[in-house]
Amino acid sequence: MELTWYGHSTWHVSVGSTDLLIDPFFGNPKTDLEPSDLDSPDYVLLTHGHEDHVAHAGAFSDATLVATPELVGYAEDNFGFEDAVGGMGMNLGGSVECGDAWVTMTRADHSNGIETGYETSAGMPAGFVVSESEPQRASDAANTAFYHAGDTSLMVEMREVIGPYLEPDFAALPAGDHFTMGPEQAAIAADWLGADYAAPMHYDTFPPIEIDTDEFVDALNATGADAEAVVLDGDESFTLG
């Protein structure tokens, strides 16, 4: 599994011959790329409807959309998407096969609206676990899994459900504070999840979410977690598994 971070919450995940793009937003200072610089992915995954997560979704409307039904409906009307998983999207707790990958939609603790003033509901906010095989009740160390937490606060569900059941190997966690978890809470999340690697995201894009990533690294080390902090530069890749 190949992971690439394009800044903010935008990630590209390659599983076998399948390419997935999560929360496309290239108007952030961590990337030098424009949407036109990328090949169209097979799937676009949207965690929620805020502008900094869907701003460039329309540039990849040839892909199959993975999002809540409410957000799928909006994206079909406004971003030009014509295809969604299951014909209408998915919802929390569901798992769908996406080419060579499996995608499980997880809970996120955040607000969710779209358009100016956020007056249009985009359904429940979400995170995603992208894995090489379908999640099973029994532990499966051979199933490589990447967790994108979306925009969220620290949740007990990370410790009780996502960690023990979905077993993420790599966790991408919002750490910019103000709108989401800060570095300390993100470090606790990494510990609860039992991930091997944890990367901060959703930071340094706007003044309210500027942080020193050393705070995340230090906080993670202080938890005694087994997770290794991975602080990527924009457009940098990481091979998992």
From Swiss-Prot:
Molecular-function GO term, any one: hydrolase activity
Keyword Hydrolase annotated: yes
The family this protein is said to belong to: Belongs to the UPF0173 family.
Disulphide connectivity of cysteines: none
PANTHER family the UniProt entry points to: UPF0173 METAL-DEPENDENT HYDROLASE MJ1163 (PTHR43546:SF3), UPF0173 METAL-DEPENDENT HYDROLASE MJ1163-RELATED (PTHR43546)
Annotated Gene3D superfamilies: Ribonuclease Z/Hydroxyacylglutathione hydrolase-like
Protein known as: UPF0173 metal-dependent hydrolase NP_2132A
Matching SMART domains: Lactamase_B (SM00849)
Keyword terms, alphabetized: Hydrolase
Organism: Natronomonas pharaonis (strain ATCC 35678 / DSM 2160 / CIP 103997 / JCM 8858 / NBRC 14720 / NCIMB 2260 / Gabara)
